[in-house]
Regions:
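C-terminal helix-rich "cap/oligomerization" subdomain common to oxidoreductases
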Residues: 38, 104-145
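A structural signal for well-ordered alpha-helical scaffolds and beta->alpha junctions
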Residues: 1-2, 98-102, 124-127
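Surface-exposed loop/edge segments in extracytoplasmic proteins
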Residues: 84-88
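Solvent-exposed strand-loop boundary residues in beta-sheet-rich modules
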Residues: 39, 82-83
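Active-site oxyanion/phosphate-handling segment shared across diverse enzymes
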Residues: 71-73, 80-82, 98
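Loop/helix-junction capping segments adjacent to catalytic residues or to phosphate/diphosphate-binding pockets
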Residues: 26-27, 53, 99, 118, ...
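Active-site loop of classical SDR/Rossmann-like NAD(P)-dependent oxidoreductases
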Residues: 91-103, 119
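Contiguous beta-strand/loop segments that form the cofactor/metal-binding neighborhood of enzyme cores
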Residues: 2-75, 92, 103-111
Length: 145
């Protein structure tokens, strides 16, 4: 969910808040996260390992919303515009859905770079920082920390 929010709303998070229910081993079995951006936009995220969830990403705007089905491996969007019938947009995988990652890795290797422009180290570290903030809020500490 964090990467999905970042792809849609960007990097300028102003405030991070959230709640989590931990297992007896200290794992966040379910959580709810709110990200408030400097632009005033907000992202509402959740994940859960104890319940079956629809795994949709929903992008809402003043004229309607878009549903990304199985957002982490999306092959279909449903576009819902106020006052109109919803319609689907397909974006099928060529093979497995990882083709774009393989192409980006090959391009970086051919250019003798250590990372891909599509997902830089800075972005990976930034998202890890958001996760660190949430884990600290929830009192999660791993044995190696």
């Amino acid at each position: 969910p964090l990467t999905f929010a970042s792809l849609i709303l960007g990097k300028d998070i102003q405030k991070i808040s959230g709640e989590a229910a931990l297992t007896d081993k200290g794992v966040d079995a379910q959580n709810s996260i709110t990200l408030k951006y400097k632009s005033g936009k907000m992202a509402f995220l959740s994940s859960c390992m104890t319940a079956w969830m629809p795994n949709t990403g929903v992008i809402c705007g003043s004229l309607g919303y878009i549903v990304a089905h199985d957002f982490w491996k999306c092959q279909r969007f449903t576009v819902c515009v106020r006052g109109r019938e919803p319609y689907d947009v397909s974006c099928s995988f060529e093979i497995s859905g990882y083709e774009y990652e393989v192409r980006a890795a090959i391009k970086a290797i051919n250019e003798k770079r250590l990372y891909c422009d599509e997902m830089t180290w800075d972005e990976s570290v930034r998202l890890m920082g958001v996760m660190d903030t949430l884990r600290n809020m929830w009192g999660i500490k791993y044995p190696f920390e």
